[in-house]
Each structure stands twice: as structure tokens, then as C-alpha cells.
Amino acid sequence: MAQVCDMCGKGPQFGNNISHAHNVTKRRWNVNLRPVRAKVNGATKRMRVCTTCLRSGKLVKA
């Protein structure tokens, strides 16, 4: 399942782990997603929403 917010479309960001010896390996920072039941067009729908959208009040919980 994709790590993408259903409200804003925010996805994972990519970068590098850098050790003390400066060994570089790839890594990714995933979005903090939460399963939520929300009202969309008057109907209840299960969505995976990032915590930024939850805190900003972009959706109405069912």
C-alpha cells in the first residue's frame, strides 16, 4: 500500500543515512498516516490521512 495521504497527496521523502564514518546509504522518511473515517460528499469513507491534515482540520470526522 502506498504511503500517500488521501487528503493532500503528501508522500515519502528520500535521502541518505550518514554514519559517523560517513558511510552513505539510502533511506526514506514516511508520512505519519492514520486511518480515519471521514465524511466526504455526505458519505462516510475510510481514508488514510497524515497527521498534518488531521491537526489543520481539513477533514470532518464521521
Curated annotation (Swiss-Prot):
Report the Gene3D superfamilies cross-referenced here. Answer: Ribosomal protein L28/L24
Q: What's one Pfam family the UniProt record gives for this protein? A: Ribosomal_L28
Stored InterPro entries: Bacterial_rp_bL28, Ribosomal_bL28, Ribosomal_bL28/bL31-like_sf, Ribosomal_bL28_bact-type, Ribosomal_bL28_sf
- Which one of the record's GO molecular function terms can you name? structural constituent of ribosome
| Biological processes annotated in GO | translation
| Keywords of this entry | Ribonucleoprotein, Ribosomal protein
Entry GO terms, CC: ribonucleoprotein complex; ribosome
What NCBIfam families does the record point to? L28 (TIGR00009)
The record, for HAMAP family, names: Ribosomal_bL28
Return the similarity comment. Belongs to the bacterial ribosomal protein bL28 family.
User: What's the protein name?
Assistant: Large ribosomal subunit protein bL28
Q: What is the lineage of its organism?
A: Bacteria, Pseudomonadati, Acidobacteriota, Terriglobia, Terriglobales
Task: Please state the gene responsible for encoding this protein.
Answer: rpmB
